[in-house]
Design a protein with these regions (language model features):
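Extended polybasic, low-complexity segments that bind anionic RNA or targeting/receptor surfaces
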Residues: 1-121
Length: 121
């Protein structure tokens, strides 16, 4: 039996439930991994900067951030990035580089199996 979700943020509880359901339906472990990371305390969430995205993600990759993406650094290539939250500075820099920001549900609709998704955080 899984642990109950003890979050009070209704949006976050809904996102975690969607991720777990997608993992059950498709058998893709990537969605379950992100759901478990978001179920943890918020102080333990990933908060990578754009410089980390530029450093570690291959060009044109689909990146999944289980937390908040921050705007320090420059983005050298266009990426599709899904994150729970994105700072305003990061949003501007991603769009200026020709990248795309999407929600977890948009990413799950486009890539249900989660193949080729890079978890950064």
């Amino acid at each position: 039996m899984s642990n109950p979700i003890r979050k009070t943020n209704a949006r976050l509880v809904d996102v975690i439930s969607q991720l777990k359901a997608q993992s059950r339906d498709t058998g893709a472990a990537v969605w379950r991994d992100v759901a478990m990371r978001l179920s943890k305390s918020r102080k333990n969430w990933a908060q990578p900067n754009l410089s980390r995205v530029s450093r570690y993600a291959p060009e044109g990759a689909t990146i999944l951030v289980p937390g908040k993406l921050l705007g320090s650094g420059e983005l050298s290539a266009s990426h599709s990035i899904a994150a729970y939250s994105v700072s305003n500075g990061a949003r501007e820099k991603i769009e200026a580089a020709g990248g795309r920001i999407m929600t977890y549900s948009e990413l799950m609709n486009e890539n249900p199996s989660g193949t080729g998704v890079v978890i950064l955080g």
